[in-house]
């Protein structure tokens, strides 16, 4: 009997779960997914936490304790999310140890309202690193223009980073540079970088959602023929840049000092278009040294009927370039698409964060978002 998730892992794709909740932790569901579904990492974001806390009674005891202590809403959010992430880190500690620190990682995002404030982002990253106090933690920092120096400085301080909200190829180049600069600075400071890790989270399905809407407005046969092709082409060309960047003398010098490469991570891999196969953003993005983080529905769908037919990225670089040429020919401004998606991405996480603050404030018996 085939095991698609095991086959995916054997092809060099690390399977991560894009979800966390206290229910999932306390019922043993996460441990079961690690044991039986090849899951070797976890990602979270403000939207995931907002839904988890709003829909569960398992946070009530901690909320009562926080209320008695009189903590503010922001501190309460940090305490609650850090507790879940710490517990998930412990569930995955065996994976972390067995993989030499490559996998077994759990991600916790900085306050998304700091997306354009580098110094405060670094301070928040440091505080969360101290609060969770687990070596297999990733701090998530968005790849905004202002986020880039924060990524470098956080890594330079010896804190592992998941760079999130990457949509475009040029920004991905800048993320790789920020990563390498951070590793270089960490080495200059005398740090052991053998356990300093990073992933670059490239968002997939949202690209198709935005581009396909524009193609529908254009409405020509040429435009319609490009439907659902951009996101995969974009991710494939990102992997090509990854291969080139991590074959340079600059990287080889860092690797010789024990540094691990920053792996590409495919995020936003659930299909938003019901006409598409529900595993398309997994099966079409298979290459060694990558991570695919999936919501549980996508994970279980791939376990049920996913197919691994060898590599599906490197053989298709020329096809991907042709997609981008065709997009330009029909009038899609890909730079505007990327800028729109980054703005929307930051705003969505800010909105979820504010909802989360509101949920916690209500539970604590006070109003406002004084986080």
From Swiss-Prot:
Name the job this protein performs: Transaldolase is important for the balance of metabolites in the pentose-phosphate pathway.
**Could you tell me the gene encoding this protein?**
tal
Active-site residues annotated for this sequence:
140
Q: Which CDD domains match?
A: Transaldolase_like (cd00955)
Under Pfam families, the record lists: TAL_FSA
Q: Specify the superkingdom.
A: Bacteria
Q: This chain belongs to which protein, by name?
A: Transaldolase
Lipid biosynthesis listed as a keyword: no
Please give the catalytic activity noted in the UniProt record: D-sedoheptulose 7-phosphate + D-glyceraldehyde 3-phosphate = D-erythrose 4-phosphate + beta-D-fructose 6-phosphate
Q: What GO biological process terms does the UniProt entry carry, in alphabetical order? A: carbohydrate metabolic process; pentose-phosphate shunt
The entry's cellular-component GO terms read:
cytoplasm
Supply the SUPFAM superfamilies for this chain.
Aldolase
Family to which this protein belongs: Belongs to the transaldolase family. Type 2 subfamily.
Q: Pathway, according to UniProt?
A: Carbohydrate degradation; pentose phosphate pathway; D-glyceraldehyde 3-phosphate and beta-D-fructose 6-phosphate from D-ribose 5-phosphate and D-xylulose 5-phosphate (non-oxidative stage): step 2/3
What are its E.C. numbers? 2.2.1.2
Fetch the PROSITE patterns from UniProt: TRANSALDOLASE_1
- UniProt entry keywords in alphabetical sequence: Cytoplasm, Pentose shunt, Schiff base, Transferase
Gene Ontology terms for molecular function:
transaldolase activity
Q: What is its main location?
A: cytoplasm
Q: Where in the cell is it found?
A: Cytoplasm
């Amino acid at each position: 009997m085939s095991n698609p998730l095991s086959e995916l892992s054997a092809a060099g794709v690390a399977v991560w779960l894009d979800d966390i909740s206290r229910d999932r932790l306390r019922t043993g569901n996460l441990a079961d997914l690690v044991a039986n579904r090849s899951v070797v990492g976890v990602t979270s974001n403000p939207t995931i936490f907002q839904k988890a806390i709003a829909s569960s009674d398992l946070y009530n005891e901690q909320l009562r304790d926080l209320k008695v202590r009189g903590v503010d809403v922001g501190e309460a959010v940090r305490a609650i999310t850090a507790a879940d992430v710490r517990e998930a880190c412990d569930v995955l500690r065996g994976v972390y140890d067995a993989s030499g620190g490559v996998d077994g990682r759990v991600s916790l995002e900085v306050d998304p309202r700091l997306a354009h404030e580098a110094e405060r982002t670094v301070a928040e990253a440091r505080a969360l690193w101290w609060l969770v106090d687990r070596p297999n933690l990733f701090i998530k920092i968005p790849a905004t223009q202002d986020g880039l120096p924060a990524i470098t400085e956080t890594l330079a301080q010896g804190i592992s980073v998941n760079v999130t909200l990457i949509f475009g190829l040029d920004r991905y180049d800048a993320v790789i540079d920020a990563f390498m600069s951070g590793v270089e600075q960490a080495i200059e400071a005398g740090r052991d970088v053998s356990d300093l890790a990073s992933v670059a989270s490239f968002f997939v399905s949202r690209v198709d959602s935005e581009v396909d809407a524009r193609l529908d407005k254009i409405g020509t046969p040429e435009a319609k023929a490009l439907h659902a092709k951009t996101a995969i082409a974009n991710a494939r060309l990102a992997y090509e840049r990854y291969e080139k960047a991590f074959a340079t003398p600059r990287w080889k010098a860092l690797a010789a000092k024990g540094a691990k490469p920053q792996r590409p991570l495919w995020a936003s891999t659930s299909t938003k278009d019901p006409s598409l196969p529900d595993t398309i953003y997994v099966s079409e993005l298979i290459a060694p040294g990558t991570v695919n983080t999936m919501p549980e529905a996508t994970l279980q769908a791939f376990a049920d009927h996913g197919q691994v037919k060898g590599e599906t990225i490197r053989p298709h670089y020329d096809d991907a370039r042709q997609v981008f040429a065709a997009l330009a020919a029909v009038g899609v401004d890909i730079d505007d698409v990327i800028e729109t998606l980054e703005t929307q991405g930051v705003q969505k996480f800010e909105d979820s964060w504010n909802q989360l603050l509101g949920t916690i404030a209500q539970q604590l018996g006070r109003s406002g978002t004084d986080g």
